[in-house]
């Protein structure tokens, strides 16, 4: 069960680069007109490399999880704001960032599809609708990762924001986060306060 998560973590790590200097963000017309995104852009980024702008498969919301939070907010989730990877590599349908701690991580990703795509589907058996931060969200686990990963998905404009809590070291990660879905919902409840509707 751990192998798919480890492969994913290694693939993400292999695609990341660290570039010295200040992080930059692209400005789009959608983010410059939306109050929540404008407020998000003012938070100091914990990224260490230039940040890619949204692409066709993930531009349905002006929200950018990679620059939406302060280091203190990220730290309050239990992960290290300095251990961040930008998952928005060229060619991927999703964009977002992953923050890590010893044995586990929190990723946030965006894709242009409705939250309802994650309900009543054989791909995510056992998915459930749940009110999260006042929004109609979905909580699900993938059979491919079993109980080593849990996702809380929230609607934002014409996209879905996924908050994924995953274990990459069973011994240390499971001790730190015994209930992945509870942590995913807890973080997603905070994320909901930042999302443009």
Please provide the spans of the model-predicted regions.
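Amphipathic alpha-helical segments
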Residues: 64-82
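Sec-dependent bacterial lipoprotein signal peptides
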Residues: 1-13
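Bacterial lipoprotein signal-peptidase II cleavage site
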Residues: 11-42
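Short, solvent-exposed recognition patches
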Residues: 76, 80-138
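N-terminal low-complexity, Pro/Thr/Ser-rich intrinsically disordered segments
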Residues: 33-65
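A short, solvent-exposed beta-edge/loop patch
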Residues: 126-197
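Sequence contexts marking disulfide-bonded cysteines in secreted/extracellular proteins
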Residues: 16, 65-67, 96-98, 149-151, ...
């Amino acid at each position: 069960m751990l192998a798919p998560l480890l492969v994913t973590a290694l693939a993400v790590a292999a695609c990341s680069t660290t570039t010295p200097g200040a992080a930059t963000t692209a400005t789009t017309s959608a983010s410059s007109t939306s109050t929540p995104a404008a407020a998000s852009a003012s938070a100091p980024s914990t990224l260490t490399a230039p940040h890619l702008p949204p692409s066709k498969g993930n531009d349905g919301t002006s929200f950018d999880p990679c620059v939406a939070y302060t280091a203190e907010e990220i730290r309050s989730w239990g992960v290290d704001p300095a251990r961040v990877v930008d998952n928005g590599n060229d060619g991927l349908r999703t964009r977002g960032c992953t923050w890590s701690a010893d044995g586990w991580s929190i990723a946030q990703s965006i894709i242009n599809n409705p939250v309802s795509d994650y309900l009543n589907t054989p791909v995510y058996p056992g998915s459930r609708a749940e009110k999260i931060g006042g929004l109609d969200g979905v909580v699900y686990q993938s059979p491919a990762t079993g109980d080593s990963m849990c996702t809380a998905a929230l609607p934002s404009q014409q996209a879905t924001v996924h908050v994924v809590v995953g274990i990459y070291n069973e011994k240390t990660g499971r001790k730190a986060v015994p209930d992945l879905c509870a942590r995913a919902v807890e973080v997603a409840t905070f994320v909901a306060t930042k999302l443009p509707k």
